[in-house]
Regions:
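Extended, small-residue-rich solenoid/repeat segments and analogous flexible loops
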Residues: 1-71
Length: 71
């Protein structure tokens, strides 16, 4: 079943990027946004499981990563 995940701005709540696929997760959505070189400044990634994610080239300036698993 396809699931849509949205990455929102942590202050305004506006949608920065959304992605829909089978077995979707915040990690898959974030990696797709990075692959497409989307602007993720201010992204709300609090508590996200991002272990092992290759975020090179991602623009996460001002993103909220509080409690995110980045190791």
């Amino acid at each position: 079943m396809k699931t849509k995940v949205e990455i929102k701005h942590w202050i305004t709540g506006s949608i920065l990027f959304e992605f829909e696929c089978d077995g979707n997760s915040i990690l898959k959505t974030l990696l797709e946004a990075v692959r497409l070189k989307k602007d993720l400044q201010g992204a709300d990634l609090r508590g996200a499981y991002l272990r092992g994610a290759d975020l090179r080239g991602a623009d996460l300036q001002g993103a909220d990563l509080q409690g995110a698993d980045l190791q």
